[in-house]
Design a protein with these regions (language model features):
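Non-catalytic helical/linker scaffolds that mediate oligomerization, partner binding
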Residues: 1-478
Length: 478
């Protein structure tokens, strides 16, 4: 059974319930809804299918809402036709609302003319077209074409190494987040996060609605990389979004940045997802390239908690085959992981002094030393199982919670099998309930050795949630 989790993107393919069923049966842990495309009716329809699939399979697949984010795009063109840009020609970007042609096009960000200056590079359509700013005249950004090509309508625009003053959250993002709260999403992945303020703003929205949705920050530009530490500190997790990242910064820098992000997330005990083009050729072909297989494996070796499929499952020709291939790569790679090395890993100074982290580290070491089959982690919030997963035990982690939202959110935690449980009022009741439910569900059997770790409050504070993971007990299942 794989330990690394897999995020699958929903799309036209998953309008077919049978395909979504097959994805959920074959290893999809989180369903990603990309709000850069589609309308609410479309997303709600797929979410309803997902809810049906959860019930049919009794598998708590989580739902992740990926925001569109503050994007810069080109405008419409005359007759809707592409225009050809030639190297060396002059081409103008304008914030005025116009119909574009081979000499000029509209840009949807009204402040771009204030952010750029002569010498800045502007990339269009994933970097296929490159412009250099010659001068700025009012609303007009006059450029020279460095790399030409065919320019279509509404293409993405990147401005490397320039601080863009776009709002952290657009009005569309805010409406989408409200929709996500109402519909019961488990995660929000915030696109184009540049500073921690974006995450704080989203969390403020969620808090005001009493929502327990967790927030994943997508790192995909130079400013986000520069502010990585402060973003990790406030986010619940990070997505290494290599698509726009590979346009905003030199492509050859992406591998070491990916490793750095994964390392820092593991030190901080935060979830990390590696995404974009992992098995991209399987959108068209039934087999991946050797380079793609190696890419997935290396992300697992780096210590990622999850890997993600995008177009492969959303609209590719082989959605289920792509998932099965990713599962097989992950399982094969995990067979060669040195689990003992993780017990010597570096953690942040804050976590080094953290009681929960110390108890979880001791639980993993104990499970290894006595050859325990399971580490059982009852938790209201899923915090205990998250801390355990970062120590990468060879033993199976069973996360248990009375919260159905927490159970689904644990689906993104490395190595954690989430199971719903009754709430307990005492330590003995907690342990007895956990073992009873796991035995009745044939998850554990008589003779199994298990380490149980949890956060327990005193009797006087029994109606409060535990503030920390603070107990460990070893049990032999009767």
């Amino acid at each position: 059974m794989k330990k690394t989790k897999i995020v699958c993107t929903m799309g036209p393919n998953t309008n077919d319930k049978n395909i979504m069923l097959e994805l959920a049966k074959n290893g999809m842990d989180v369903a990603r809804f990309n709000f850069s495309h589609g309308d609410y009716a479309e997303h709600q329809s797929r979410l309803e299918i997902l809810k049906e699939v959860r019930k049919e399979l009794d598998r708590p697949v989580a739902a992740l809402l990926d925001t569109k984010g503050p994007e810069i795009r080109t405008g419409v063109l005359k007759d809707g036709k592409k225009v050809s840009l030639k190297e060396g020609q002059t081409f103008t970007l304008t914030t005025r609302e116009i119909i574009g042609d081979e000499t000029i096009t509209h840009i949807n960000y009204s402040g771009l003319n204030e952010d750029v200056a002569a010498g800045n590079k502007i990339l269009i359509d994933d970097g296929l077209i490159e412009l250099e700013v010659e001068k700025v005249e009012g609303t007009e950004i006059v450029c020279t074409v460095i790399n030409g090509g065919e320019l279509g309508e509404k293409k993405g625009v990147n401005v490397p190494n320039v601080k863009i003053k776009l709002p952290a959250l657009t009005e569309k993002d805010k409406e989408d987040i409200r929709f996500g709260i109402k519909q019961g999403f488990d995660f929000i992945a915030a696109s184009f996060v540049r500073t921690a303020d974006c995450i704080r703003e989203i969390k403020s929205m969620l808090d005001s609605e009493g929502s327990a949705i967790k927030v994943i920050a997508k790192i995909e530009n130079a400013e986000g990389i520069d502010n990585l530490d402060e973003i990790i500190a406030v986010a619940d997790g990070i997505m290494v979004a290599r698509g726009d990242m590979g346009v905003e910064i030199p492509a050859q820098e992406v591998p070491h940045i990916q490793k750095e992000i994964i390392r820092k997330c593991n030190e901080a005990c935060k979830t990390v997802i590696t995404a974009t083009q992992m098995l991209d050729s399987m959108i068209r072909n039934p087999r991946p390239t050797r380079a793609e297989v190696t890419d997935v494996a290396n992300a697992v070796y780096d210590g990622t908690d999850a890997v993600m499929l995008s177009g492969e499952t959303a609209m590719g020709k082989y959605p289920v085959d792509a998932l099965k291939m990713m599962v097989s790569i992950v399982e094969e790679t995990e067979a060669y992981l040195d689990y003992s090395a993780y017990r010597r890993r570096k953690v942040t100074e804050e976590n080094m002094k953290n009681i929960s982290n110390a108890v979880c580290a001791a639980s993993v070491a104990t499970a290894h030393d006595i050859g325990a089959d399971y580490i059982i982690a009852p938790s209201i919030t899923g915090f205990t199982s998250m801390m355990l997963s970062k120590w990468r035990p060879a033993a199976r982690i069973i996360g248990m919670s009375p919260s159905t939202t927490t159970v689904r959110q644990m689906m993104l935690q490395w190595g954690v099998t989430p199971i719903w449980s009754r709430r307990a009022e005492s330590t003995d009741e907690l342990i007895e309930n956990s073992l009873e439910e796991l035995k009745s569900g044939n998850v554990i059997n008589s003779g199994d050795l298990a380490v149980i770790t949890a956060g327990i409050v005193t009797y006087a504070r029994r109606h409060e949630a535990a503030a920390a993971t603070n107990i460990m007990r070893v049990v032999s299942v009767d």
